[in-house]
Amino acid sequence: VVIDAADYAKVLEELNNGGVTRETKFYLAAKVFENTAAYDALISSYLRGITGNAFPDKLTLTYEKAQTMRYGENPHQNAAFYKNPLMTPGALSEAEQLNGKELSYNNINDANGALDVLREFKDEVAVVGVKHANPCGVGVGATVAEAYQKAYDADPISIFGGIVATNETIDLEAAEKMAQIFLEIIIAPDYTEEALAVL
């Protein structure tokens, strides 16, 4: 069974050369079962959500590969980023990368940590700095620029090369402050055009 149009050319080529190889058959079979298992797991997850059963006797989770990472926890390791198809609002997996190089495992881990801390600030303009899975600065202010300055001042050494996240739109003033040092990732719900030109 061929369930992915991306595999058609490979299967046709092998058929034209005498038959589909054993290796390809196992590859295709695995792909079919991955998809049917994922489908069943999604239905189970949906129904569990309706019934409110948070702790079922058996739990099957399914994730879709979002991207291959630049590298794993260390440069010699491989990694991939998977997302839950039944994503929650504000999940990192739904973020759009606007520019920059491919992300690494550490980038994803730090970005997720920054968002976890940021969720604690629902009614305040906040900025969180994270590096190597540790918060290195948190600031609250009237503006993103003010909150960023407080987060930066908490530890101006550690925040260099780290991840910064805010829960408000980044404007030109905030972008100019952030652009003064190297930051791996800057996360925000939105950016003004002027801010994007600086970053």
Regions found by a protein language model. Give the residues of each.
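Active-site cavity-forming subdomains of large catalytic enzyme subunits
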Residues: 1-2
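Active-site loops and adjacent core secondary-structure elements that bind or stabilize anionic groups
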Residues: 7-199
